[in-house]
Amino acid sequence: MKVRNPEQISIPASNTTKDPGLTHSQIIRMVNLVKKTENMNIFEELWETLRNLFRSDKHSQTAARQILKDAFYFQNCDGYSKYFTGAVDEKARDRFTHRLKKFNELKEHAKDPEMMQARGSISPDNMLCVSFYIGNIEIYTQKLQLGISPSTGGIDLSNAYLSGISLNGACLRKADLSNAEMDKISLCSSNLLGADLHGAKMNNAKVISSDLSDTNLSDTDMSDTDLDDTLLRNAKMDNTILNNAYMEDTNVRGINLSKADLSGQDSAKLRSRG
């Protein structure tokens, strides 16, 4: 998608001469369902505007349209109660999880998944913000207030759903990320000193040049994760899965790797680093 104007997303609609050219504010209005009297018309225009982001085969077009519709017409799902244990507001948790999951599902049908990004940040008062981007255009931002973990004293992200989010440069010192779902997350240049990631899933993640010293990574699945130039000093890694992880120049000083799954690693070389 080529953005002609930073104030406008204009994508030629498939099989039609209509080009809605929806503005940034109109898209936000659609997602928030402000004009409730014309929801269906708004959804149809949103779909016609965005459909060319997705592969043109019938399966992908049908699936993407339904996923977008599910995201647009939010309904509570009991399955979301297992996520974000530290969320202050349950309804906000459900909406947050729902839209992030649907965004990730949409990316699976995109012609260029890199054009669709979820960029996150964490404020000093423990507010998790995630903005959805198409290209360089921010189309929607959602926020979730989180509490303090009684076990670590840091932000409570236990059981969080953070898959696919870019949290580069985040300060997550002593964060509770136990049992979090973080597949394909990007945490490059982040500070996770003393964080608890026990039982987390981090397949295909990017954690380059980050500080994971003194973290609890026991039972964490980090298969295919890029840990290049990352500090893992004194991390606890009992039963940590590191299948095919990338660990160039990773500092593992003080780590007992005897119980870690090092499939795809040269364990002798790995133990000599740091």
Task: Go through each PLM region and give its residues.
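Non-Sec secretion/translocation targeting segments of pathogen effectors
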Residues: 1-30, 46, 50
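N-terminal capping/linker segments that flank leucine-rich repeat
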Residues: 7-13, 100-156, 266, 273-274
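Intrinsically disordered, low-complexity regulatory segments in eukaryotic proteins
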Residues: 27-41
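Extended non-catalytic scaffold regions that mediate assembly and binding
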Residues: 37, 83-87, 119, 216, ...
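Type III/flagellar secretion export determinants
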Residues: 40-55, 171, 188-191
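Low-complexity, charge- and small-residue-enriched intrinsically disordered regions
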Residues: 44-90
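Tandem repeat scaffolds
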Residues: 139-274
